[in-house]
Amino acid sequence: MVLSAADKTNVKAAWSKVGGHAGEYGAEALERMFLGFPTTKTYFPHFDLSHGSAQVKAHGKKVGDALTLAVGHLDDLPGALSNLSDLHAHKLRVDPVNFKLLSHCLLSTLAVHLPNDFTPAVHASLDKFLSSVSTVLTSKYR
């Protein structure tokens, strides 16, 4: 999915509001995913999945850091996320549908924390961005 200039502007502006909360929001989105889509827990059998768990927070930080990296490389998502794509496709073998589920939970989390900035246009741009990230992360499954 191609991000327009307006989408890129919206994504960068929204992510600038996330600021230093990327890891916190990533962890919250993971918790939402585990609660709303319990089958996703199967990829984390070694994690303490309880609310506020250090392991969920640590993985949330990884998610947040990866998205921050992606926002900084909107014109080259495949290059920026190549290592993560390899990891998820070849080592972790995460079912691609789970990226869509996490994206949904990330959008919900951002809507809660950025209510004044989460306009329909920003929502659409973030959805396209997360869809693009998901596409890149699943590109090496083939």
From Swiss-Prot:
One of its GO terms (biological process) is cellular oxidant detoxification. The modification Phosphothreonine is found at T9, T109, T135, T138. Heme b binds at H88. GO terms for molecular function: heme binding; iron ion binding; oxygen binding; oxygen carrier activity. Residues 2-142 form the Globin domain. O2 binds at H59. InterPro entries: Globin, Globin-like_sf, Globin/Proto, Hemoglobin_a-typ, Hemoglobin_oxygen_transport, Hemoglobin_pi. The modification Phosphotyrosine is found at Y25. PROSITE patterns: GLOBIN. The modification Phosphoserine is found at S4, S50, S103, S125, S132, S139. Keywords: Acetylation, Heme, Iron, Metal-binding, Oxygen transport, Phosphoprotein, Transport. One of its GO terms (cellular component) is haptoglobin-hemoglobin complex. The modification N6-succinyllysine is found at K8, K12, K17, K41. The modification N6-acetyllysine is found at K17. SUPFAM superfamilies: Globin-like. Red blood cells. Involved in oxygen transport from the lung to the various peripheral tissues. Heterotetramer of two alpha chains and two beta chains. Belongs to the globin family. This is Hemoglobin subunit alpha. It comes from Equus caballus. The gene is HBA.
